[in-house]
Amino acid sequence: YKHGRRIALAPLLARLIAARLPPAMGNRVIVPVPLHRRRIWQRGFNQAALLGRQLHQLGHGPLCVDALVRNRPTPPLGGLGKEARARTLSGAITLRPARVGMIADADVILVDDVLTSGATSTACVKALKRGGAASVTIACFSRVLDEALAR
C-alpha cells in the first residue's frame, strides 16, 4: 500500500477497518498517525491520513489530520526491535496545542496502516491522553506478528 504507492487501495482498506469499528456515537474524532513533514515530502502522502479521510467519508466521525505532530524526523523503524522502536519514538509525537479543545473528552479513533510493535501507537495514545482524550481506539488494517520484535 504505502511503499508500492498504491493509494487507490485506501477506500477498500478503510472499509475493512470500518467493519470492525463500533458505531459512531457521541464526541468521536478520527486522528491519523502523523508523519514528519520530510517523510510526507519524500513519499508524497500520509497513508494514515488517506485511511482517516475514507473513514470520515464512511461516517465514522470528523477527521483531524493535524491533531498529532511528529516533532522530529525518525529513521524508518523496520528492522528495529520493540525497545529500539520505543526509544526512537520517545518524545517524537505530541498533540498540537491548537487541537486540545477538539481532543479533550473525545473518543479518538487513532488510524494507522500497520501495527508492528505498538511503539508508534503507544506514543500517539500517550499524547492524546495527555490532551484529555476520553478514550483512544487504535484502528489499522494489518498487524505484524513477529517474535523478533519482542527483543
Can you describe what each PLM-predicted range is?
Residues 1-110, 117-151:
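Conserved PRPP/pyrophosphate-binding segment of the phosphoribosyltransferase/PRPP-pathway fold
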